[in-house]
Amino acid sequence: MTKLFIPYIMGDKDLIENATLLSENGADIIEIGVPFSDPVADGPVIMEAGQQAIKQGITIDYIFEQLEKHGNQIKCQYVLMTYYNIICHYGEQAFFEKCRDTGVYGLIIPDLPFELSQRLKQQFSHYGVKIISLVAMTTDDKRIKEIVSHAEGFIYTVTMNATTGQNGAFHPELKRKIESIKAIANVPVVAGFGIRTPQHVADIKEVADGIVIGSEIVKRFKSNTREEIIKYLQSIQQTLNN
């Protein structure tokens, strides 16, 4: 099975240009961050990118507008990573309707409790927008079974400080956890935690069905040339599916 490459970008003024570049250079699904004033789940790089986007005047309305006008330029699926407050403020039904109309494949909502995610799935499943399940490495087995049994799209396994030493190897316990999730899952199980280098990718791809790269992609769009970004994406893609 081909491994999924899921890069993350901040929804900002360069959203369509950046997403198009990613989709033309190996991305299977693109995660688009919706800037929010209190992003509790974001690291410093993504938090700073979100603050810059807010200063640019970026809102969820702007992101929807861009996807509506130019989403056909993005040659792969895309999901929104957003906090529930934004959905609530927009209006749940209106939000799901807009996601459907702008081609959004799914939603990653890091501050959404499992029970609330189930209500949203039941209420708005007819819009065809997946709610992606997040599983932390600290989640107990009983809860994991519950989450996995209701998962759709893909499962996003998240942890912090998962690498051991400087060689980019991930902790054996982390790999065992991913394998145990895969054993009971009916959708791909992807890993997204501090993955930056081809070495990280080579190590974690042995167990995960795909990878999410966030902060490193955001940093490179900020400081690298287009050619350097493409070279990096190609190195990740080659390592992932070698």
Swiss-Prot record:
EC numbers for this chain: 4.2.1.20
Gene Ontology terms for molecular function: tryptophan synthase activity
Active site: residue positions: E31 (proton acceptor), D42 (proton acceptor)
Catalytic class of the enzyme: lyase
Q: Which reaction does it catalyse?
A: (1S,2R)-1-C-(indol-3-yl)glycerol 3-phosphate + L-serine = D-glyceraldehyde 3-phosphate + L-tryptophan + H2O
Keywords annotated in UniProt: Amino-acid biosynthesis, Aromatic amino acid biosynthesis, Lyase, Tryptophan biosynthesis
> Subunit structure, per the record?
Tetramer of two alpha and two beta chains.
* Protein name, per record: Tryptophan synthase alpha chain
Q: Which organism is it from?
A: Staphylococcus aureus (strain bovine RF122 / ET3-1)
Gene of origin?
trpA
